[in-house]
């Protein structure tokens, strides 16, 4: 899996270019099947959960095809790359929100629109609780549960690359009053999808950086994480 994942990570750079600059017709040709797309075609606000795959850029293009969706981004240090990224994404998503604009993204959904949100990342402990992720307790953002409690749909999008294109499937995460139960089901949707194509998951993404015991399983990133924590405190 390690070797295949490294290959897929490299291929992801090519897929990024395809996502940013290909025509809609080319994107349509890459989509084998979009199962349950009708779930997303209503006029109600929906939080659309995306997965961190090695082809995440093309995933956003595929899932938003023919649908008006907003998305979040983390600014890149290189201003040129950042400019290219935002301009490219603005061609196929309705609005690009800074990753720190949480309240704006929630308002976006409340206004009857669809927001792409990657809930499989570690946002720290401030707005998260620990929930199993592959039987490992992982810091899990609680925003999706909050949205579901406001009677908005939370829909997980599974995308796997096959030999002849990409399979896309939408599945609603059933609302639950209990926060832990809802988030456990959400994480299970993620892990079930990852198991289908483990080589396509972005394992270099630090999913387990916040630990119950306060430990650090990514020591090489320690200084960068300390800087980001200070940035979050000052924001």
What do these predicted ranges mean?
Residues 40-43, 103-235:
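Non-catalytic C-terminal accessory region of glycerolipid acyltransferases
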Residues 35, 72-74, 98-100, 171-173, ...:
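Conserved beta-strand termini and adjacent loop/short-helix elements that scaffold enzyme active sites
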Residues 15, 57, 120-122:
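Acidic side chains
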Residues 28-30, 78, 95-99, 137-138, ...:
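A conditional alpha-helix N-cap/helix-loop micro-motif detector
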Residues 2, 6, 78, 82, ...:
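A structural signal for well-ordered alpha-helical scaffolds and beta->alpha junctions
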Residues 1-49, 60, 82-88, 93, ...:
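Membrane-anchoring hydrophobic helices of lipid-metabolizing enzymes
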Residues 31, 54-59, 75-77, 116-118, ...:
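Short hydrophobic/aromatic-rich motifs at helix boundaries and adjacent loops
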Residues 4, 42-100, 125-132:
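Catalytic core of membrane glycerolipid acyltransferases/transacylases, capturing the structured
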